[in-house]
Amino acid sequence: MAVIGATGYVGAALTEALARSAQWDVVPVGRTDHETHRTAGRYDVLINAACPSKRFWAEQHPGDDRRETVDKTRLLREHWRWDRFVQISSISARTQLDTVYGRHRAEAERMCSGAESFVVRLGPMYGGDYRKGVLADMAADRPVFASGRSRQSFAPVDWCAGWIAAHLEDTGLREVGARTTVTLAEVRDAVGSGSQFAKDFVDDQFPITATGPDWPDAAAVIDWLAGRRVSGARAS
C-alpha cells in the first residue's frame, strides 16, 4: 500500500494509523521520492492524500490548485499500478461548488468511480499538526472569514485516519466527521476568543451520509481549542 502525500496533515495521520494496524506494508510517498515509488511495482491500495487543503490559496491560484488536485488525481490513476484507489477529498466538494476549491475537488472525485475506488470526504478536523483554519484563527483572536452561524462537524484527525484505515475495502463515497455539529460562534464564545466573524458567508460543513453512534461529538473541539489557547498564552 502507498500513501501519496504522507507528510501532509491527513497523510501523516493516516500513515501512522495504517502502521498501527499492522495489516499493511505501508509505503509513505512524498514529493522527493514520488517517482522512485511509482516505478517500484504494483500496490494493493493507492491512497491519494495529497490534494492541498488551502481554500483561499486555491481562489488566488486556480491553475496551480487544478494541477495539484485534478491533474494529480488523473496522473495517479493513469500512471501508477494499483488494485484499489482511495481518494481523500473534502465535504467542500459538495458544499462549496461556487468556489475553485470545491469545484476542483468535485471534479477530481468524478474520476474515482467504479468498484475499485472509494472516495472519503473529510469535514473539519483538529489535533495532530494543526496549523491553519478557523480554529487557528480563533486561537489567535484573528478574524474568521465565515459566519458564526456556520455549523461544523469538528473531528480529531487521528480518529478520521483510523476510520479510513478500517474501511479501505469500502466503495462509493462517504462523508466523515463528527456525528454532531457545533456553530463557530459557540466554539468562539466557549473559549473566550476575540475573533470576529464574516456576517454573510455561512460555511456549513458536516456529513450527510450515514454517521455512527461511536463517531465523535463535535463539541469536544472546545476543550482542545481551550487548551491550545492556554498553551499559546504561556508560550508568549
Sequence positions of predicted segments:
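NAD(P)-dependent short-chain dehydrogenase/reductase
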Residues: 102, 111-153, 157-159
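NAD(P)H-binding glycine-rich loop region in Rossmannoid oxidoreductase-like domains
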Residues: 33-76, 91-95
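N-terminal Rossmann-fold cofactor-binding loop
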Residues: 27-35, 124
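Short-chain dehydrogenase/reductase
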Residues: 4, 8, 62-67, 98-109, ...
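Conserved Rossmann-fold NAD(P)-dependent oxidoreductase catalytic core, especially the SDR/UDP-sugar
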Residues: 74-103, 118
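N-terminal Rossmann NAD(P)H-binding glycine-rich loop of SDR-like oxidoreductase domains
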Residues: 1-24
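Mid/C-terminal beta-alpha module of Rossmann-like enzyme folds, strongest
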Residues: 163-215, 222-236
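Active-site beta-alpha turn of Rossmann-fold NAD(P)-dependent dehydrogenases/reductases
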Residues: 50, 86-90, 121-123, 177
